[in-house]
Curated annotation (Swiss-Prot):
Pathway: Glycan biosynthesis; glycogen biosynthesis. It comes from Heliobacterium modesticaldum (strain ATCC 51547 / Ice1). The keyword Disulfide bond does not apply. Pfam families: Glyco_transf_5, Glycos_transf_1. One of its GO terms (molecular function) is alpha-1,4-glucan glucosyltransferase (UDP-glucose donor) activity. Belongs to the glycosyltransferase 1 family. Bacterial/plant glycogen synthase subfamily. This is Glycogen synthase. It catalyses: [(1->4)-alpha-D-glucosyl](n) + ADP-alpha-D-glucose = [(1->4)-alpha-D-glucosyl](n+1) + ADP + H(+). InterPro entries: Glyco_trans_1, GS/SS, Starch_synth_cat_dom.
Length: 484
């Protein structure tokens, strides 16, 4: 008898290529493809946001929220297959009132929107004839669904054997709403207590997921440890310590087809680990594009949201010392006006050393990776970080603070397996010292060339991460179904 493939429904608020607000969408578009290429029967569920085409009609049904009936229409799309793999079906949960909008997040009725999505998701499984072994949820928007699965739907025979996994991509974002959201969703009022969903007088959707998920993971091993501390736990560290035996860390991968300097359509000159001449030409093109002198001065790239989390304040107070060095800095990003203003001032004071683009532009970001010698990630905290993994792929050496996924993926060049420059203390002078160590390394040309070739050959594909997720799924299934 042929063994049935593992069935996984991957649930996310955003998924590339359909809708994206942040890195979650990249994960949700890439990990299912890698799972499918490993033989998993994986499907994706998400809302049909306003910018998403209608897709093929599958079915519709009524969903009860707030003691009234709302219609959910299911439409289907697909994520293209990896080479040698299978394409991934995507189920769009369509309700114009809640999701026919321009943005994914940031509305006053977000509690109702994600509450409706949660119940509509669980009601969808039988109409589409797909009862998964694993419901893989992502971030706070899925919290109500996890609670509903455990508190209500577990009594339904078809749902009894489903195991739930919650991936926390960034614990800072939790989803806080008034107590009345429980009635809207249809969750019991007695769950409004400190050991369940109550959090400082509000309902916390992330906490709902952390309390009721069978297993939890974050997007790096170090971040899984960090969120159990008061410094990084955002008020949920006590709960996470209680659940430490159910908490795991799996580092994200990157889409090595998209991020490939040998084929990337956004960079002017292609190159590889075997021949990096194209990278030198890309650097000159980048310098010209940003109005910088074309020179061999080391070029530092920074492509981030300009917010506290990314460590941008570490530039404050080291500007004069930094730009006395023989270097150039190219910045692409937007965010806090304080940090946008900081880089505008630096551009004004050091016009031959600083290139700046306020905003986000994917082709331009790719050119920064393709032309930079170093890539800066001095993050205050970083659950995983994709920037350093992309930088490796393009031969830009990361200069990072040792936190979260940066600690898991970047090892200082002082060690035999080193692949970047790492500093520990969150202090401007430590950041400056790390940059200076990088500049010293850059001047050792033979060692520098060897390091570039080495980091470009590192394997940070999703296939490796997918193998770890399959092990996690097995553990979750055995927890719910001990007979397996």
């Amino acid at each position: 008898m042929t063994e049935q493939p593992l069935k996984v429904l991957f649930v996310s608020a955003e998924v590339v290529p359909f809708a994206k607000a942040g890195g979650l969408a990249d994960v949700a578009g890439s990990l299912p493809r890698a799972l499918a290429s490993s033989g998993v029967d994986v499907r994706v569920a998400m809302p049909r946001h306003g910018q998403i085409p209608r897709g093929a009609y599958v079915t519709d049904y009524m969903v009860e929220v707030d003691a009234r009936k709302e219609t959910a229409v299911i439409r289907e799309g697909r994520i293209e297959a990896l080479p040698g793999g299978k394409s991934v079906p995507v189920y769009f949960i369509d309700n114009y009132q809640y999701f026919g909008r321009e943005n994914i997040y940031g509305y006053s009725d977000d509690g109702e929107r994600w509450g409706f999505f949660s119940r509509a998701l669980l009601e969808m499984l039988e109409p589409i004839d797909f009862i998964p072994d694993i419901l893989h949820f992502n971030d706070w928007q899925c919290g109500p669904a996890i609670a509903l699965l455990k508190e209500e739907y577990r009594h339904h025979p078809a749902y009894r054997r489903i195991a739930s996994v919650l991936t926390v991509h960034n614990l800072e974002y939790q989803g806080h709403f008034g107590r009345d959201i429980l009635q809207f969703i249809g969750l019991r009022q007695d769950l409004f207590r400190p050991d369940a969903l109550e959090f400082y007088g509000q309902v916390n959707f992330m906490k709902a997921g952390l309390v009721f998920a069978d297993l939890i993971n974050t997007v790096s091993r170090t971040y899984a440890e960090e969120i159990q501390t008061s410094e990084y736990g955002w008020g949920l560290d006590g709960l996470l310590r209680l659940r430490h035996s159910d908490l795991f860390g799996i580092v994200n991968g990157i889409d090595v087809e998209v991020y490939d300097p040998a084929t990337d359509p956004h960079i002017p000159h292609h190159y590889s680990a075997d021949n990096i001449e194209g990278k030198k030409r890309n650097k000159a093109e980048l310098q010209r594009q940003f109005g910088l002198p074309v020179s061999e001065a080391p070029l530092l790239g920074l492509v981030h949201r300009l917010v506290d989390q990314k460590g941008i304040d570490l530039f404050e107070g080291i500007e004069e010392a930094l730009f006395r060095e023989d270097l150039q800095l190219v910045v692409v990003g937007q965010g806090d006006p304080r940090y946008e203003g900081l880089f505008r001032r630096l551009k004004q004071h050091f016009p031959e050393k600083v290139g700046l683009f306020i905003g986000f532009d994917t082709p331009l970001a790719q050119r920064v990776y393709g032309g930079s010698d170093f890539f800066l990630m001095p993050s205050r905290f970083e659950p995983c970080g994709l920037g350093q993994l992309i930088a490796f792929r393009y031969g830009a050496i990361p200069i990072v603070r040792s936190t979260g996924g940066l600690a898991d993926t970047v090892t200082d060049v002082r060690f035999p397996n080193g692949n970047g420059v790492v500093f520990e203390a969150y202090q401007p002078d430590r950041f400056l010292e790390a940059i200076r160590r990088g500049l010293h390394l850059y001047r050792q040309k033979d060692r520098w060339q060897q390091l570039i070739a080495k980091v470009m050959r590192l394997d940070h594909s999703w296939r490796r991460s997918a193998d770890e997720y399959m092990q996690l799924y097995g553990r979750a299934r055995r927890k719910v179904n001990p007979e397996l």
